[in-house]
Amino acid sequence: MGQPWAAGSTDGAPAQLPLVLTALWAAAVGLELAYVLVLGPGPPPLGPLARALQLALAAFQLLNLLGNVGLFLRSDPSIRGVMLAGRGLGQGWAYCYQCQSQVPPRSGHCSACRVCILRRDHHCRLLGRCVGFGNYRPFLCLLLHAAGVLLHVSVLLGPALSALLRAHTPLHMAALLLLPWLMLLTGRVSLAQFALAFVTDTCVAGALLCGAGLLFHGMLLLRGQTTWEWARGQHSYDLGPCHNLQAALGPRWALVWLWPFLASPLPGDGITFQTTADVGHTAS
């Protein structure tokens, strides 16, 4: 029987719109960061050594961020191309009527991707793709380096934004921080002032969001859970922090955070998973 997801495509304009908007916002943040590091506007000005160190840190963060984004988008966590027929169906297997296929435990069907995802966690709206077995590692590293980049930009833009705000009344300051678009459209700020306020606002909010996401998924990582399993209170796959880290990040789990292209193959296949019950039977 043909698989409906084999012919389906999620590469249309609606599916790619979140990714395009995310890329445009990331480009704006990158340009603002380069502007601050190269020209050093606002007090206090960066010295040559400080500027060189900041540029090196920014390059390291951006390489890691872009590398993990590329790995995340290139990795397919779905059942496409995975040989499921002929495998022994055991406890936890289910039949997906949309995909017309048996699917293994921890899988879930995504209505946006129109296919079942191995070890499905959730659908990432900003990047337009599901987070699952095949791309969980770059997703976690992406959260870490995105939070770092956004925090870095916020700190660098802080002095310039502070100088801008001190030159105006408190009401003007509040309006610029809360309604920068309105201030631009009414002609009360220049385009450069709007860009400074808007990028700083979004960077602070983005850093908080990515930081919260990293803490949440770090907790799930140590517990060996997906978001769905956490919501349902399931702990069947929690084999201890060390085993859970290796299962999700590979044997070099402590180093994968430093470079996206570091080889650390996952020990599993996304289809069969060891449970706490299996460990108990083996020990007995």
Swiss-Prot record:
Q: Which cell locations does it reside in? A: Membrane
UniProt topology in membrane: Multi-pass membrane protein
Protein EC: 2.3.1.225
Cysteine disulfide links: none
Example of a GO biological process term: protein targeting to membrane
Gene Ontology molecular-function annotations: protein-cysteine S-palmitoyltransferase activity
List the Pfam families: DHHC
Where is the major localization of this protein? membrane
What catalytic activity is recorded? L-cysteinyl-[protein] + hexadecanoyl-CoA = S-hexadecanoyl-L-cysteinyl-[protein] + CoA
Active site as annotated: C124 (s-palmitoyl cysteine intermediate)
Task of the protein: Probable palmitoyltransferase that could catalyze the addition of palmitate onto various protein substrates.
The protein, known as: Probable palmitoyltransferase ZDHHC24
Lineage, highest ranks first = Eukaryota, Metazoa, Chordata, Craniata, Vertebrata
Q: Which gene encodes it?
A: ZDHHC24
